Structures are given as structure tokens and as C-alpha cells.
């Protein structure tokens, strides 16, 4: 029975910001209230994802949370009200192979999943349940889809993938348009992450092989690649996030210091000094800022699996770990209200 007190508690909980992370050991997803510090871990969903968690995102309205994972159905979505609701029924046509990452359109009316097997991307209408899978693009991405994002206007969808050209972008009107011409200078290796600036005027790709991050002006087509930062990320670029104001870009990567942040004004500024306490002791795999831009979170291998720092244009002192840690290597991280572009 829901009492007046418990109902009020649920409403307060639902209104709080939350931080969510995926990991490679059951329950594969961990969510915590966020108030500038970690709250008590939210109870696991009744039906867990079926394998290692990879990507994670909330709907733009924050009323559902989606998890990409290994093993069919490859994507699991739950109503969200500060706690997990009953898992939404799987789509009639599942993504082909392990789900890697997913994104919702800015309007929240479609969900896109990057996945392991051809066609490497699957998009579904979203109304709180999955609609019929949208027809594949005429020109498929050339390899495993690893990350996905929409422009802020929702007019284009981008897929980071293995195999040249490593990035594929399509006009989006509820169906796929003709693939946009490749950039003149391709990313230098398999792509792992993609993000648009909040203003939508640049697209950033994290990838294997130096320089490990490539950024291009974006006007519906790729512009000339922006000059590399003076100090490159030290290892394979995995995930990318811009601050909500668009004035900094963060790259999670392999090799110490595992996170690199740069001022962004359409070109790279001087790399921000590393945090005093680095995230974990091996690969940074996911990165996100709070919607207000006052904290930055990194999902990483090795305990504590997630590290969060105050952010004021520089790293503050690492925030205390949650009382209940994620149970395995952190794969991705997001905040409720953080827009994955």
C-alpha cells in the first residue's frame, strides 16, 4: 500500500537529479540520487538487463531509462520515477547483436540503438513503448556501431563505428535520408564515441589511433577538420561529452590520466590540469556532465568504477565514492537531464 508519506517520498525522489552507470557484472546498472554527492543506491529493477551493460540514457523528459547490453534483447527500457518500473516489452524486431549505446531524439519520439551486427543501427518510434522498427538506411554503417547521437535540432543522426570511414551521418525526419558525404579527413581509427556541441555547430569523434579525437564543423555536412589539441589524449578515445554551455570538451580514454578536458571555442584550448585523484587505475570508458555543468563523472575500469569531480572549468576534489559501489568495470555514465547529443 502506498501511504501519503511514501507517495510524497516517491515524488521527492522522482524530482531529484540521478546519476546512472552501467557495468559488466550483475545487476549491470546502478543508479544513485545526486545532490553533489551520492545518495543511497536505488533498488535494482525487478527484471535485470540480460548481460554486461554498455550504454545508458534517460529520455529527454526523464520518465524512462534505457540500457544497452550484451545478450538479447540487447536493449532494456524501464519507466523511471526515481525508482525502476516494470521493464517495457521488447521491440518486435530486436537489435542484431549486443547493444552498445543508444540515444533518444531531442523530442523523445524515437530511440536509436548502435549494435554489434548488421545493420549496426536500429531506430524505433518511442511512445513509452517500442514501435515498429524504422527501415534501415540505404547505405549502412560499415562495421560495429559503438555510439550514436542526434543533432540538437534532431535533423541528423550520427553513428560512430569500426571500419573506415568510422563515422556515418544521415538526415533524420523519422526515417533515414541519404548518407552525408564523409569528411575529407577521416578519423584515424575505429570510432568509439560521438557528440555534437550543444549549439550543433561541431561534431566530435573519439577513436583509436592518434590523435584519438577528431572534431569537424557541422552545417549538415562535414567541414574541414579542426586542428588537433596541443596535448593529445594519452590513449584510445572512448567517450566524449561537452559541457552544457559548450565551452569545454571532455574525452574519456585508455592510458593515464584516463580523462582529458579542453576549453572549446571552435578550436581546442590548452588542456585542463588533471584531477589530483585520477579516475581508477586503467581505462576511462564513459563521461558525462551534470545538466547544470557543475560536476563531471567518469565511468572506468577498476574500483570504485565511477569517479565524480566538481567542475568549474577545472577539476575539484574527487567526491566521496557511493556507499554501495557498482559491481564491476564502469562502461558508461549519465545524469538524468544530461542530453546525449
Regions found by a protein language model. Name each.
Residues 16-17, 61-63, 107-109, 153-155, ...:
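Short coil/turn segments that connect the beta-strands within blades of beta-propeller domains
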Residues 306-308, 325-341:
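Blade-level signature of beta-propeller repeat domains, shared across WD40, Kelch, NHL, RCC1
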Residues 24, 70, 116, 162, ...:
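Short loop/turn segments immediately following the C-termini of beta-strands
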Amino acid at each position: 500500500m502506498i501511504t501519503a508519506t511514501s507517495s510524497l517520498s516517491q515524488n521527492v525522489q522522482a524530482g531529484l537529479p540521478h546519476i546512472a552507470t552501467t557495468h559488466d557484472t550483475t545487476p549491470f546498472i546502478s543508479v544513485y540520487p545526486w545532490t553533489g554527492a551520492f545518495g543511497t543506491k536505488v533498488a535494482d529493477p525487478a527484471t535485470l538487463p540480460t548481460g554486461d551493460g554498455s550504454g545508458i540514457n534517460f529520455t529527454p523528459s526523464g520518465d524512462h531509462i534505457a540500457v544497452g547490453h550484451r545478450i538479447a534483447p540487447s536493449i532494456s527500457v524501464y519507466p523511471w520515477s526515481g525508482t525502476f518500473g516494470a521493464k517495457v516489452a521488447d521491440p518486435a524486431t530486436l537489435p542484431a547483436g549486443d547493444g552498445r549505446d543508444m540515444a533518444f531524439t531531442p523530442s523523445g519520439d524515437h530511440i536509436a540503438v548502435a549494435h554489434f551486427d548488421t545493420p549496426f543501427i536500429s531506430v524505433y518510434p518511442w511512445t513509452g513503448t517500442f514501435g515498429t522498427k524504422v527501415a534501415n538506411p540505404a547505405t549502412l554503417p560499415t562495421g560495429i556501431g559503438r555510439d550514436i547521437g542526434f543533432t540538437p535540432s534532431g535533423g541528423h543522426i550520427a553513428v560512430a563505428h569500426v571500419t573506415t570511414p568510422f563515422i556515418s551521418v544521415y538526415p533524420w525526419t523519422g526515417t533515414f535520408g541519404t548518407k552525408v558525404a564523409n569528411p575529407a579527413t577521416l578519423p584515424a581509427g575505429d570510432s568509439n564515441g560521438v557528440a555534437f556541441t550543444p549549439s550543433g555547430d561541431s561534431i566530435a569523434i573519439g577513436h583509436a589511433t592518434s590523435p584519438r579525437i577528431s572534431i569537424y564543423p557541422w552545417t549538415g555536412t562535414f567541414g574541414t577538420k579542426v586542428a588537433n589539441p596541443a596535448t593529445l589524449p594519452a590513449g584510445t578515445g572512448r567517450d566524449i561529452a561537452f559541457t552544457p554551455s559548450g565551452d569545454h570538451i571532455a574525452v574519456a580514454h585508455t592510458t593515464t590520466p584516463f580523462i582529458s578536458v579542453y576549453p572549446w571555442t571552435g578550436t581546442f584550448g590548452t588542456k585542463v590540469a588533471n584531477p589530483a585523484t585520477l579516475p581508477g587505475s586503467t581505462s576511462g570508458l564513459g563521461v558525462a556532465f551534470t545538466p547544470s555543468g557543475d560536476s563531471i563523472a567518469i565511468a572506468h575500469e577498476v574500483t570504485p568504477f565511477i569517479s565524480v569531480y566538481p567542475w568549474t572549468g577545472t577539476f575539484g576534489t574527487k567526491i566521496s565514492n557511493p556507499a554501495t559501489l557498482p559491481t564491476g568495470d564502469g562502461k558508461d555514465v549519465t545524469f538524468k537531464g544530461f542530453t546525449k547529443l
